[in-house]
A protein has these predicted regions:
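Hydrophobic faces of well-ordered beta-strands that scaffold small-molecule active sites
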Residues: 1-6, 23-29, 58-64, 81-84, ...
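Short, charged N-terminal helix-start/capping segments
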Residues: 1-23, 74
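Active-site-adjacent beta->alpha loops and helix N-cap segments on the catalytic face
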Residues: 9-13, 17, 34-46, 86-100
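Generic secondary-structure signature for well-ordered alpha-helical cores
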Residues: 19-23, 47-51, 99, 103
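N-terminal active-site wall of soluble small-molecule enzyme domains
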Residues: 29-75
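A short acidic, glycine/proline-enriched capping/turn motif at secondary-structure boundaries
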Residues: 66-69, 81, 89-90
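Amphipathic protein-protein interaction modules
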Residues: 71-82, 96-104
Length: 108
């Protein structure tokens, strides 16, 4: 089950718990977080966590709502798991891009 995180302390707590239990953590942004917090904020959060918790297995899913532009920006910034609920044609194009950069696009 994914843990919804909206701050660095929340993400750290979830990863510390996963680290102590020896399991992988599934982190997920709140709905429409790319619009609310910004893609760059979550990209920096992801980079900080990858550095701080280098030995801990985790995924971070950024919810981009129906905004294809934000989903594309998230892929450009290196976020590896994007939630997108927009137009099916946009989803197909984004999925193709995600595959090329080793990322994953998931529906809502």
């Amino acid at each position: 089950m994914a843990t919804v995180i909206a701050s660095l302390p929340e993400a750290r707590a979830a990863l510390e718990a996963a680290k102590s239990s020896g399991g992988a953590a599934e982190l997920e942004s709140p709905p429409d977080a790319a619009s609310i917090y910004g893609v760059l904020w979550f990209a920096e959060l992801d980079r900080a966590l990858l550095t701080e918790f280098a030995g801990t297995s985790f995924t971070l899913t950024l919810d981009c709502g129906s905004r294809a532009d934000l989903a594309h920006a998230a892929l450009v910034e290196g976020i590896k798991r994007i939630r997108f609920s927009g137009h099916p044609e946009a989803a197909k194009a984004l999925s193709d891009i995600a595959q090329q950069v080793g990322a994953e696009l998931v529906g809502s």
